[in-house]
Amino acid sequence: MCCTSGCALTIRLLGRTEIRRLAKELDFRPRKSLGQNFVHDANTVRRVVAASGVSRSDLVLEVGPGLGSLTLALLDRGATVTAVEIDPLLASRLQQTVAEHSHSEVHRLTVVNRDVLALRREDLAAAPTAVVANLPYNVAVPALLHLLVEFPSIRVVTVMVQAEVAERLAAEPGSKEYGVPSVKLRFFGRVRRCGMVSPTVFWPIPRVYSGLVRIDRYETSPWPTDDAFRRRVFELVDIAFAQRRKTSRNAFVQWAGSGSESANRLLAASIDPARRGETLSIDDFVRLLRRSGGSDEATSTGRDARAPDISGHASAS
């Protein structure tokens, strides 16, 4: 289950009236290309913050704060927040909004006007421990992978995305929704669904439901996390899902050099060559690379190559 413990909110949260007033004051019109749909329901932002489990000890990286609904709830939780906003108009107004609704809490907010995909470690004064984000479908996967790679300090990610994207992120091996994002996120941690969000809590109202997804980074990674190893694992994932309906033996022929060598490598990794790539877990891909000479059996984490399966299959809550 998702973490739901929290404290009583004391900061004034934004409602429908405040959201509309702010937009009118700024002469702001939401841009569909940026996925600008803003939450105006206090119970929803409370729920997102509770699902994230953030506390006073956290430095939260909020992606896409918009008009500030979720920002205020995160600050009221006691967290320090760095808000990354791509829209310069919204970024310039956020601190004023927080000051008006929280009095003395604005000192715990830093605003960065930047595309999240261009964000680097040196852009932040301190390493974030958590991410909370409301992401449009077209940037959700690249943004999540970029943040998990760029900021190894992040221990938990809580993201609100379109329901269809949420299903893909947390899908089980072999399911229709299971794909490249499902596997790659599990390289970093356990992935789970945390429920649905109605379109009626947003302005403008989107046409689809949203879903909450939480990613908990492994406390101790069962495999190396350096860029070189990750890229080689991800290469295998991309190969398998480029031809997801093929048998693993046939999908990996070019990578292995021949059909027989492909079968031998799969068997060495305890994978049936007749299995389709869409059924393989992150553990399978890592094991395939290792048993094919892709890395030493002794890893940088001190874990054996035959580490138990902790791929973090999704669970609904």
From Swiss-Prot:
Cellular location(s): Cytoplasm
Keywords tagged on the record: Cytoplasm, Methyltransferase, RNA-binding, rRNA processing, S-adenosyl-L-methionine, Transferase
Residues annotated as binding S-adenosyl-L-methionine: 37, 39, 64, 85, 115, 134
Annotated stretches, region: Disordered: 293-317
Top EC class of this enzyme: transferase
Enzyme Commission identifier(s): 2.1.1.182
Main location: cytoplasm
Entries under PANTHER family matching the protein: DIMETHYLADENOSINE TRANSFERASE, DIMETHYLADENOSINE TRANSFERASE-RELATED
Protein's name in the database: Ribosomal RNA small subunit methyltransferase A
